[in-house]
């Protein structure tokens, strides 16, 4: 039993070390530290139960969120045009529309502070196989950003986007947060692919979650 307690204590120490190294917002870090103290207390008292599993899993995800880590945007219109032309033949109207988009981002960056700077949502519409997904990857490359692809087609539950309650054993975050964690930055391009192909019985719930996000 003492060996088991030692293993748990080492796991908690690793979580604490990760929290110290992570650039977590102050208020959130305070809450996470309270959770860690509660875990340490439960191990000391020998009261390991489901709560330990739930809390440690939550903390492990929380400390891996890349708070404060971003990629610098490359808003070079000539570079973007070169990237688009390398990956897609024709599509002149679409390319020009995206170049206009980059020009607007350039103006925003010059005239607004980083806090007020925002990139509008882009909607790619077209028949199957016309290059919507690959164009999104080209846009991410042109911007110098990482990309996270979330396939909505066939998704049967909004929980896949939002995630489960942390109180549920074996719970995990939704695909959006998972994608951000896996990308290692807070500002990846998030591609919601085949958004029109969500399962009929879950379509409204999924759209509701997207509006909320």
Regions found by a protein language model. Give the residues of each.
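The Walker A (P-loop) glycine that initiates the GxxxxGKT/S ATP-binding motif of P-loop NTPases
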Residues: 124-126, 163, 194
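Extended, charged alpha-helical coiled-coil/arm scaffolds that mediate oligomerization and mechanical coupling
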Residues: 1-107
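Conserved P-loop NTPase mechanochemical-coupling segment
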Residues: 146-166
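Conserved catalytic/switch belt of AAA+ P-loop NTPases
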Residues: 192-213
């Amino acid at each position: 039993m003492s060996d088991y307690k030692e293993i748990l204590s080492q796991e908690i120490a690793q979580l604490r070390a990760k929290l110290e190294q992570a650039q977590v917002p102050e208020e959130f870090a305070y809450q996470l530290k309270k959770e860690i103290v509660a875990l340490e207390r439960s191990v000391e008292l020998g009261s390991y139960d489901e709560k330990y599993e739930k809390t440690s899993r939550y903390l492990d995800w929380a400390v891996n969120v890349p708070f404060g880590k971003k990629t610098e945007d490359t808003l070079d219109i000539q570079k973007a045009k070169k990237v688009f032309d390398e990956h897609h033949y024709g599509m002149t109207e679409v390319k020009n529309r995206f170049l206009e988009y980059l020009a607007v981002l350039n103006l925003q960056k010059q005239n607004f502070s980083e806090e007020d700077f925002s990139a509008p949502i882009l909607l790619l519409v077209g028949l199957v196989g016309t290059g919507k997904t690959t164009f999104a990857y080209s846009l991410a490359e042109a911007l110098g950003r990482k990309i996270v692809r979330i396939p909505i087609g066939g998704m049967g539950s909004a929980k896949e986007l939002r995630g489960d309650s942390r109180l549920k054993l074996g719970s995990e975050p939704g695909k959006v947060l998972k994608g951000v964690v896996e990308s290692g930055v807070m500002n990846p391009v998030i591609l919601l692919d085949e958004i029109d192909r969500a399962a009929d019985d879950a379509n409204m719930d999924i759209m509701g979650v997207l509006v909320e996000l």
